[in-house]
């Protein structure tokens, strides 16, 4: 039984399951040309999710207070990680003001006094990392990913993608991770079929 400790001493248990082959990532050439310095990674863990984690929410509330004190609404998109993703959106022909990066959207909610959605411990943790870092972080149930390779490319016209809580999302021109079945995540939203 392994445990992951949160910065303030909180913890969530991580239980090993049968050894699964880690997914590999292939970056399409057209994407790599626009984002040559891109660095990505995959972290895999067998976890037991819970409805809420009070100590995690203490960290989330602290980070929300820090964001609200440090930024005005029109300054959020100047954070380097958010700015880099917005630049990629523009390079692929997508308007980052219409299709916001999830980390930017979360920070904007905080500044407007709306807070962060409370979903469950795993999603809440991912949202904290996203808000703190400025990067859009995807979290997927590995058992729902088809195949051994994820492909990072650009959304195509007419490509079907059902964003979590958003319905059908036009991902043409958005960076998108795909498995053997289709899109599973963009920096704006993850796909319904791969949620935990």
Where are these regions (language model features)?
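A residue-level detector for conformationally permissive "hinge/kink" positions
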Residues: 1-2, 165
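Short, Lys/Arg-enriched N-terminal segments with co-localized hydrophobic residues
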Residues: 3, 9-21
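Charge-biased, low-complexity intrinsically disordered regions
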Residues: 12, 21-196
């Amino acid at each position: 039984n392994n445990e992951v400790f949160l910065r303030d001493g909180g913890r969530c248990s991580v239980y090993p399951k049968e050894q699964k082959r880690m997914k590999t990532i292939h970056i399409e050439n057209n994407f790599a040309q626009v984002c040559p310095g891109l660095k990505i990674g995959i972290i895999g863990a067998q976890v037991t999710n819970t409805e809420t984690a009070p100590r995690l929410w203490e960290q989330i509330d602290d980070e929300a207070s820090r964001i609200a004190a440090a930024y005005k609404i029109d300054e959020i998109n100047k954070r380097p990680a958010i700015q880099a993703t917005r630049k990629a959106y523009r390079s692929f022909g997508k308007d980052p003001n219409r299709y916001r990066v999830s980390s930017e959207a979360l920070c904007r909610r905080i500044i407007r006094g709306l807070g962060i959605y409370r979903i469950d411990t795993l999603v809440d943790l991912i949202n904290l990392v996203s808000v703190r870092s400025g990067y859009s972080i995807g979290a997927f149930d590995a058992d729902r990913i088809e195949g051994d390779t994820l492909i990072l490319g650009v959304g195509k016209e007419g490509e079907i993608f059902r964003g979590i809580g958003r319905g059908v999302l036009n991902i043409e021109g958005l960076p998108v991770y795909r498995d053997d079945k289709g899109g599973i995540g963009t920096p704006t939203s993850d796909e319904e079929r791969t949620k935990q």
